[in-house]
Swiss-Prot record:
This is Ribosome-recycling factor. GO terms for molecular function: ribosomal large subunit binding. It comes from the Bacteria. One of its GO terms (biological process) is translational termination. It comes from Fervidobacterium nodosum (strain ATCC 35602 / DSM 5306 / Rt17-B1). Its main location: cytoplasm. Keywords: Cytoplasm, Protein biosynthesis. It is found in: Cytoplasm. PANTHER family: MITOCHONDRIAL RIBOSOME RECYCLING FACTOR PSEUDO 1 (PTHR20982:SF3), RIBOSOME RECYCLING FACTOR (PTHR20982). GO terms for cellular component: cytoplasm. Responsible for the release of ribosomes from messenger RNA at the termination of protein biosynthesis. May increase the efficiency of translation by recycling ribosomes from one round of translation to another.
Length: 184
């Protein structure tokens, strides 16, 4: 039972960190990267399909070039990008859709860093909430006589170590994203 607390805590904290890492991946950095299109879906023969599955996406300089497998998808892809809340402006030249990424201003970059910080803080709160819930469960089990006081203290220490580990991991994710945003 003692090890199950640690295993459960680690699994939950790891999932929280992975979720935050995924959110950070989708945060704009001003770079032309196909990852910005991952969430954009089009209606492909009645099935919502990601743009990345119906077109070849390449990066050239400061732009993405989207070349659909079927030419009739050009307008559909263009409209889907315009409808997304990414603030991108696609240009359809009849054979490909191009998306230009202008050099971001310092103000835009600072805004993106601030957003990254908010996302990471949400992750830290989630990790700490997991710690709080598990520690409450441990105290309840001790009161019920299911675990000893020594086990309780050892678990509290191990749970705190896990919390510190995953909070540090979130800090590293933020530093990496901040560097990526501010580097140009």
């Amino acid at each position: 039972m003692v090890n199950s607390f640690i295993k459960t805590t680690e699994e939950k904290m790891k999932k929280s960190v992975e979720k935050i890492a995924e959110e950070l991946k989708h945060l704009r950095t001003g770079r032309a990267t196909p990852a910005v299109l991952e969430e954009i879906k089009i209606d492909y023969y009645g099935v919502p399909t990601p743009v990345l599955q119906v077109a070849q996406v390449t990066t050239e300089e400061r732009q993405l070039v989207i070349k659909p497998w079927e030419r009739n998808l050009l307008n559909v892809i263009e409209k889907a990008i315009l409808a997304s809340d990414l603030g991108l402006t696609p240009v359809n030249d009849g054979t490909v859709v191009r998306i230009n990424f202008p050099t971001p201003t310092t103000e835009q970059r600072q805004k993106w860093v601030k957003k990254a910080k908010e996302i990471v803080e949400e992750g830290k709160v989630a990790v700490r909430n997991i710690r709080r819930d598990i520690l409450k469960d441990i105290k309840d089990k001790k009161k019920a006589g299911e675990i000893s006081e020594d086990d309780e203290k050892r678990l509290e220490k191990e749970i705190q170590n896990l919390t510190d580990k995953y909070v540090a991991e979130l800090d590293k994710l933020f530093e990496k994203k901040e560097k990526e945003i501010m580097e140009f």
